[in-house]
Structure formats: C-alpha cells, structure tokens
C-alpha cells in the first residue's frame, strides 16, 4: 500500500532472524534489507549513519531503548504500529523503572492494536494524545486464494479431495508430544486423517523429525513429498507457507499456547481461511483477539491431549457446524480489516508526501 501511495519512497527493512531475512529478500516493495543492530550506541549509530532515515517505524513489541533514545536525540520521529503490550510485559516494563517509561514517551506516536495496549501505554506515562487505537494490520496481510490455487496446493501436498486434514501451526517444544498423542487417538476414529505439523522455528525440524521417528509415526516432510500417500503426518519444513497451508485443513491448532509461559501465536491466518481454531490456555499475547473470537464461537480452548482429540473429533464429524464457523469467521475478519490503509496514510502524512487521489 505504501509503495503504491509513494513510489519514490525508499524503504529499508530490518530483521532479527535468518528466516526473516530470507523472506524479506523476496519482497519486491522493499529497497534494502539488513539485520537489526544490537541495541548499544556504536551499532545503532553506525546503522543510522548509513541509512539516515527520515522516519522510523517499528511494529508489535519492538521496543529498543537505546535506538529509540538515539532517534529522539537526532529528531527522527519513531512510530509504533500494531502496538501490543501484554499485562505481563507491562508489569516488567514498570519494574524496570524509568528505562522503558522514558522509551515509550520518546515515541512520536503509538498506534495500538486494541484498548488493552492503550491502557498499558497510559500506565507507562505516555500522553493520551500520543496514543491511538487503529487495529491490527495482520487482518489485511493475507490475500485470499482462488479455488484453482487451493487445488494446486492440495495436489502439491498429494492430498485426496476427501482426505480429512488438521493443521498444528507454529508449535513450540513440548507441544508436539501433546499434539501427536491427540493425533494417535484421532486416527482410531478417523483412519485417513492427516496432520500437517508446522514447528514455529525451522531450526527445530530435526528435533521434531526425531520425535516422529521415536513415536513410530508414518510421516513425510514438505520438502520430500514423494511418500505422502502413506503418511499420517506431513512435517512442514519450509518457510513462508503456513498461511496458505491452512487452506488445506478442516481444523487448526495454533501453538505456543499449551506450555507455560506460552503467549500464543496469531489466530488470524487460520480464521481467514474459515477454519475453527483451537489453542491452549496460555494466550496472553493474543488474548484480546481470542476473547472476541471466543464470544463468536470461532475459537476453542483445550488444555491436554484428551481435550484436543475430543474437540478435533467433534469438529471433524460435524461439517455443518464447520461451515457455520467458516461463514462467521470470514465476516469477523472483514470487520477487523482496514488498519493497513490507516497506517500507510499516517506514514505518508508524516513524511509530507502528497496522498494520491
């Protein structure tokens, strides 16, 4: 959106992981990609001297006290978009004394996902006039797949049209054991059921592969789908595919939520494909979205293998209920969209670019 509004704008994107760097290199609207500097003066000074930004934008929870202070001293406005401050994080920031209070107060403006984040920012001493709730741009990030694209993806994964599939996305250590326990029970009732298992971090693929072997599951990986027909588990060992892979399933589970401290990963991607979504009890980072979706009957909490198996089974055997959830989920996603447009407009205004007609 921003590139369309201001084609002459130079956009430099910082990342913190190798996988993020690899993904960013494929974004045609980004002019340069670099690893975010360590948050101490020699490194931040060097980065700013090379880039010489007119505006710094950070998303979600990227609060770098040293960098924000340096930007403030150089009169470079810093904006927070998709701002999120959980209750646990707010307590930590308050315990840190003046460090994070001063950091938040040095932002030019904070654009928060929801009123919970707004309240936390106020508690940290940010002036109310410097805070605005604009929503979460993640609702705008996914482009809907056509039926033809979904069919091509299904064929790529060598799935039959009537094969039941459930997807466990963004899983963390300790969760795969629970998920596989539930899957083993589910296969008794649904012999053809396929689990697509997607660990959050690619460096854990070998660890999860070893677990699958130890538990004697027939499995294949996304990178070698030659034997998918006989597998009950497909291990997603590629980057950047999970969002679209949700389109293959009937039910989804979202990780980093079954084991303390958890926090939860995004519910938005599976909901955008109309899937009923399950999560564990530890969802502080996504609580606001989860509560709204819970109230609309779109997501469900489970705490152990038995509850996970029971809920997946109930949803699999009730296609009419899944269809009802799917229709409601699409309406829910549409109602939450619009934050990305607002953010692009804000950046354009801050840089004094004329807004296109």
Residue ranges of each PLM-predicted region?
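Nucleotide-activated sugar donor-binding and catalytic core shared by glycosyltransferases
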Residues: 1-357
């Amino acid at each position: 959106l921003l590139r369309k509004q201001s084609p002459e704008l130079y956009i430099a994107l910082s990342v913190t992981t190798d996988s993020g760097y690899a993904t960013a290199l494929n974004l045609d609207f980004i002019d340069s990609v670099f690893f975010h500097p360590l948050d101490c003066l020699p490194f931040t000074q060097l980065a700013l001297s090379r880039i010489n930004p007119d505006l710094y934008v950070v998303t979600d929870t990227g609060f770098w006290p040293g960098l924000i202070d340096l930007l403030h001293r150089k009169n470079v406005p810093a904006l927070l978009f998709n701002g999120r401050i959980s209750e646990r994080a707010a307590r930590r920031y308050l315990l840190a004394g003046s460090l994070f209070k001063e950091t938040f107060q040095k932002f030019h403006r904070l654009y928060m996902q929801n009123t919970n984040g707004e309240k936390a920012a106020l508690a940290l001493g940010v002036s109310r006039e410097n805070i605005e709730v604009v929503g979460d741009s993640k609702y705008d990030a996914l482009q809907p797949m056509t039926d033809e694209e979904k069919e091509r993806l299904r064929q790529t994964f060598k799935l039959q049209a009537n094969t039941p599939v459930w997807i466990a996305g963004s899983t963390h250590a300790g969760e795969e054991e629970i998920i596989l326990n539930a899957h083993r029970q589910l296969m008794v009732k649904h012999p053809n059921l396929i689990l697509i298992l997607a660990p959050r971090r690619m460096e854990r693929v070998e660890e999860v592969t070893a677990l699958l072997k130890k538990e004697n599951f027939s499995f294949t990986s996304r990178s070698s789908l030659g034997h998918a027909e006989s597998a009950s588990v497909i291990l997603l060992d590629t980057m950047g595919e999970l969002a679209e892979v949700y389109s293959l399933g009937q039910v989804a589970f979202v990780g980093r939520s079954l084991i303390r401290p958890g926090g939860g990963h995004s519910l938005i991607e599976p909901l955008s494909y109309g899937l009923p979504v399950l999560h564990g009890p530890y969802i502080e980072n996504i609580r606001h979205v989860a509560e709204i979706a819970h109230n609309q009957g779109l997501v469900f909490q489970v705490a152990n293998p038995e509850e996970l198996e029971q809920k997946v089974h109930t949803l699999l055997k009730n296609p009419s209920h899944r269809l009802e959830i799917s229709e409601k989920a699409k309406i829910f996603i549409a109602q939450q969209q619009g934050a990305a447009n607002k953010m692009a407009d804000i950046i354009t205004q801050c840089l004094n670019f004329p807004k296109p007609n």
